[in-house]
Amino acid sequence: MSYQTIIEDNIDILVAGAGLGGTGAAFEARYWGQNKKIVIAEKANIMRSGAVAQGLYAINCYMGTRFGENNPEDHVRYARIDLMGMVREDLAFDMARHVDSTVHNFEEWGLPIMRNEKKGSYLREGRWQIMIHGESYKPIVAEAAKKSADKVFNRVCLTHLLMDESKKNRVAGAVGFNVRTGNYHVFKSKTVICGAGGASNIFKPRSVGEGAGRVWYAPWSSGSAYGLMIEAGAKMTQMENRIVLARFKDGYGPVGAYFLHLKTYTQNAYGEEYESKWFPALQEMVGKEYLDPEVSHRTHRPIPTCLRNHAIINEVNAGRGPIHMVTMEAFQDPHLEEIGWHNFLGMTVGQAVLWAATDVDPKYENPELTTSEPYVMGSHATGCGAWCSGPEDVSPPEYYWGYNRMTTIEGLFGAGDAVGGTPHAFSSGSFTEGRLAAKAACKYIDDGKAEGIRVSDAQINRRKEQIFKPLETYRVYSNEVVAGSVNPNFINPRQGLDRLQKLMDEYCGGFGVNYMTNDKLLNIGLKKMSILGEDLEKVAASDIHELLRAWELKHRFLTSESVFHHTLFRKETRWPGYYYRGDAMKLDDKNWHVLTVSRRDPETGEYTMEKAPLYHLVGDAETAPPTDHH
């Protein structure tokens, strides 16, 4: 196999992954680094990559401070309530205080944001969400990043970070391959900003067979944000905090616009309100501090997302499913009916197609909702990711080591899904985190922290051999296929993924076991994971596309292993409705009012787990009373 080796040298800032986090990093890096060499490497094409690829109908994170709507502290409180207390408040505050300027940039670049004609402010869907005509959201934002970067490498999948050989624990770039040509790409860089995606398809999905890939989170998000960093030895945090979504059944169309803008509501199969009956027992589990429906009703304090899921799961288990979204009332209004369909056509076309194909007209019947399989990510309503330094002006000493959004590996920064402890960033917040990381990366270089980096040819050649090994395995053993795809000497990526998903579902609390696990199941699962890890050394790829699938699988595996270790470590049920520890069914603030932190030793693969302090830096009092935003 004679694939070319293409070396890109003397890079100042390498942006790994060009979703919203990566595009934000490239854009801001040019502002602070006028003379710096900025390079983007993207697995797909920057114009339509990442979670926003097919558009969005709302920007879910906007303070509206210029309109007197909210302050950053308010958003920290909101995220803290929704995540059952588990938030890196320094990072969340830092993102929130800068996110509005990001949204104003988007509008300046041509993103159509709907306006409230009476107030002149943006049209609110909810307290934090603003409505957009966002089918072309990603191409608009990508243009700014393309103009900022010296080079954009599309179709290059990064598989490993390069490490400096002159100073331990310092990044030196990354390597990967072109998914079309197969060429080996080497990027030697002073800093790396990881803006790669979180992980879908690590738990067995509900959508299988002809529906495979119709999942809520981007199916191409293969946990590379975590795979790249875990493999290099970066510390991770809150990886147990997976997310389960209540969405329209089988198409996973979003429900936000329906609840907030169309004012629809849910009921069980028999037309009954069902949530409140589950709250007394749930309050026993989590405590009044986290669930107090009376206070929520009086103060508009939201009930945490996971607890609403808990009510759905239990109502269905009690035999009163399915849960329906009551659309028949709202859809009698032609304007609201149009918005309901537009909402999907601007961001989840598959849901509109599915309803049309299965004769579901929400004007005449109330569509079903379901809870999804779990996903692992750090920018929606959950906070998995790397343990990163916060900003110098608000972070306590345990959260600060010199440069904002820098991981525990020197010169390696994160944005979006890659950063742990910052939920509710969404698209605008991820772009903002990219900006913050880029500003810090420029300072890191200007402070002389990236001098004298050395990468040997031996490291580069070793990685090349490793990356292309699945092709070699296939070439050597492909003639020994027994039948179909069964081979005594290798497994293919699809077989490996099926195995991984089965393990995650049955042992780590997927939908197949009603999101339930315990210490015994997790330990058995970890044993089986280690055997799967051995077998992944024998994964085979018949072509370059399958090589991409093989490396996506390896990143998903590393992510999943981390999720297992974190879920085992946190001996409580912190987020009922996301998952349950059957051996510790209560929330336990006495022992677990902490953030979990892990590190995988790159040499041995062994995990060490620790507790990190959880500081509430923002007080409980509102700084701005919530007004009626509709």
Please annotate each region the language model reported.
Residues 100, 107-160, 167-170, 238-426, ...:
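Mobile, glycine/GP-rich and aromatic-enriched active-site lid/loop segments adjacent to catalytic centers
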